[in-house]
């Protein structure tokens, strides 16, 4: 059985930092979005190549990590190990006061000039653009370009950026560094370099599969998520981006992570496609024992759907970046847990041993379900995490935070190891991320396609709840009708009905729940066939 943690109620102040960072990062993918333009063999204006190493200047920002010099696969690991051997230092880098006070509209008015994109003049399959510092993004992030085992520090160049009419102040000439970067690739159309991936804000990053629009995000590491004393947000302080090959569909990014509790070295091997794959290799060097740590964390948004529209006044039927948490556990079960926007913060932990995969999924791909011409939620990518090797005992943790606005990311998932990671140790782990419409391979299986609920009596108000769960069959529907088994941790289940659903090439399960005096009930539904068949198990947490 699935082991679940009882939810705890926390003061709103404990999650404000999380919401602010998530909202800020949500802006980063669009704040600098320029119109995609075809690749040109001969740009109309002079091309700016990656800068060479320059002599130190009084106006140059101190380079701490990405110093020009030799670089190999162990360079970042050595830096992280050395960093963790010393007490954590809060880095403060000078920045004109006006940049810190920029409004959202002013900040998005600072745009990277596509003509200055790194590698634009070299005919490579990838290009790179940097983000300016300012607004919420005030940390200086160091960046280096790696070629032939040689790292070259990428100094700030004001000529890389243009300022529109909204921002009134001039851009600085001093080397103030960058706040992050994004990678472009001919993901959707030959000759057009679209955004593929963004690194900006703490340890946040996100990517796209073919045809996707930015939605959920990932992080390098989660620490103390939903902790009453507040969450700790590690930061990627520096990046080393390897120059891609002409004939390769691969770009490699190295990153140095730091926080009061831990330092770490990360390697991201990125392969764009229908489902963009990112192989992540990480080594953590804890300064303190990590007892509240989350590996491979994802952050998303769920406002409402047919699964729950309480107190909703919205013309759109559904509003979410993800609609469910999918898990393939070590026992071979496939579990589907619809997301919710609860009235109180909820934390669920799904115990496992050697997980095979988990991720926040956007399963509903129909525009009619969202009716939002601008947000295009049907294009938001799913994110599937496949552990490499045996991750041992632990739990997939799901955090659902109440929100009244879609600008706030309120969903977090990650893997929490059962045993704390000791201080002074070296902890290595690896996993594959798949970003796209369908990152999980289809099989001849039965999957949950829709969850809806409402009051059980349409004639009058009642506390009794009706649940409707639709299943879709990938393949030919068998003649037999499966048996339905519904369990609950409290209340009374009644009127369980299973029927064929020709419109969905599958089945519809309906049942009623009488909560009685409970304010939180765990639900579990299974379909049983006479012959072996992979069927998703439906899980749900009902709350008042």
UniProtKB/Swiss-Prot annotation:
UniProt entry tagged with the keyword Nucleotide-binding: no
GO cellular component: outer membrane-bounded periplasmic space
Pfam families xref list: MdoG (PF04349)
Keyword Transmembrane recorded: no
Recorded metabolic or biological pathway in which this protein acts: Glycan metabolism; osmoregulated periplasmic glucan (OPG) biosynthesis
GO MF annotation list: carbohydrate binding; catalytic activity
Gene3D superfamilies linked to this entry: 2.70.98.10, Immunoglobulins (2.60.40.10)
Covalent S-S links between cysteines: none
Region (Disordered): 36-58
InterPro entries registered for this protein in UniProt: Gal_mutarotase_sf_dom, GH-type_carb-bd, Glucan_biosyn_MdoG/MdoD, Glucan_biosyn_MdoG_C, Ig-like_fold, Ig_E-set, MdoG_OpgG
Annotated keywords: Periplasm, Signal
Lineage: superkingdom: Bacteria
Leader sequence segment: 1-33
Location(s) in or outside the cell: Periplasm
GO biological process assignments: beta-glucan biosynthetic process
Function: Involved in the biosynthesis of osmoregulated periplasmic glucans (OPGs).
Family: Belongs to the OpgD/OpgG family.
Listed name of the protein: Glucans biosynthesis protein G 1
Record gene name: opgG1
């Amino acid at each position: 059985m699935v082991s679940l943690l009882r939810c705890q109620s926390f003061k709103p102040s404990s999650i404000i930092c999380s919401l602010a960072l998530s909202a800020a990062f949500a802006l980063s993918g669009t704040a600098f979005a320029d119109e995609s333009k075809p690749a040109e063999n001969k740009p109309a204006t002079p091309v700016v190549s990656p800068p060479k190493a320059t002599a130190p200047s009084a106006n140059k920002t101190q380079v701490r990590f990405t110093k020009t010099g030799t670089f190999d696969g162990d360079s970042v690991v050595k830096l992280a190990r050395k960093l963790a051997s010393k007490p954590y230092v809060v880095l403060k880098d000078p920045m004109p006061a006006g940049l810190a006070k920029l409004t959202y509209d002013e900040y998005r008015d600072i745009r990277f000039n596509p003509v200055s994109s790194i590698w634009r003049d070299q005919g490579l399959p990838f290009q790179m653009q940097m983000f300016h510092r300012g607004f919420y993004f005030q940390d200086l992030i160091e960046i280096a370009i790696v070629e032939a085992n040689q790292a070259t520090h990428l100094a700030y160049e004001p000529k890389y950026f243009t300022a529109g009419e909204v921002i009134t102040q001039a851009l600085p000439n001093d080397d103030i560094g960058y706040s992050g970067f994004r990678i472009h690739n001919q993901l959707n159309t030959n000759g057009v370099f679209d955004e593929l991936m963004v690194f900006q804000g703490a340890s946040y990053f996100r990517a796209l599969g073919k045809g996707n629009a930015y939605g959920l995000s990932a992080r390098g590491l989660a620490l103390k998520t939903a902790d009453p004393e507040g969450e700790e947000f590690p930061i990627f302080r520096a990046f080393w981006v390897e120059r891609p090959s002409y004939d390769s569909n691969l770009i490699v990014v190295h990153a140095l992570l730091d926080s009061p509790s831990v330092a770490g070295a990360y390697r991201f091997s990125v392969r764009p496609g229908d489902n963009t794959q990112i192989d992540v290799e990480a080594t953590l060097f804890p300064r303190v024992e990590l007892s509240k740590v989350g590996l491979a964390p994802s952050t998303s948004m769920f406002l409402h759907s047919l699964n729950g529209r309480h107190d909703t006044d919205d013309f759109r039927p559904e509003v979410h970046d993800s609609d469910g948490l999918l898990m393939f556990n070590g026992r071979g079960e496939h579990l589907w847990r619809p997301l919710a926007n609860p009235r109180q913060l909820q934390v669920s932990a799904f115990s496992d041993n050697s997980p095979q995969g988990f991720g926040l999924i956007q399963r509903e791909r129909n525009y009619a379900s969202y009716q939002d011409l601008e947000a295009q939620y049907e294009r938001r990518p799913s994110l599937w995490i496949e552990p490499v090797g045996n991750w041992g005992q632990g739990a997939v943790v799901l955090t659902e935070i109440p929100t009244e606005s879609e600008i706030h990311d309120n969903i977090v998932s990650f893997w929490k190891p059962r045993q704390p990671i000791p201080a002074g140790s070296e902890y290595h782990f690896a996993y594959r991320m798949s970003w796209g419409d369908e990152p999980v391979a289809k099989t001849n299986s039965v999957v949950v396609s829709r969850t809806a609920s409402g009051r059980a009596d349409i004639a009058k108000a009642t506390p009794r709840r009706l649940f409707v769960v639709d299943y879709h069959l990938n393949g030919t529907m068998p003649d037999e009708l499966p048996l339905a088994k519904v369990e609950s941790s409290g209340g009374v289940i009644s009127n369980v009905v299973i029927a064929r659903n020709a419109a969905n090439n599958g089945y519809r399960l309906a049942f009623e729940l009488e909560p009685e005096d409970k304010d939180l009930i765990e639900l579990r539904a299974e379909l049983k066939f006479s012959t072996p068949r992979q069927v998703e198990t439906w899980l749900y947490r009902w709350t008042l």
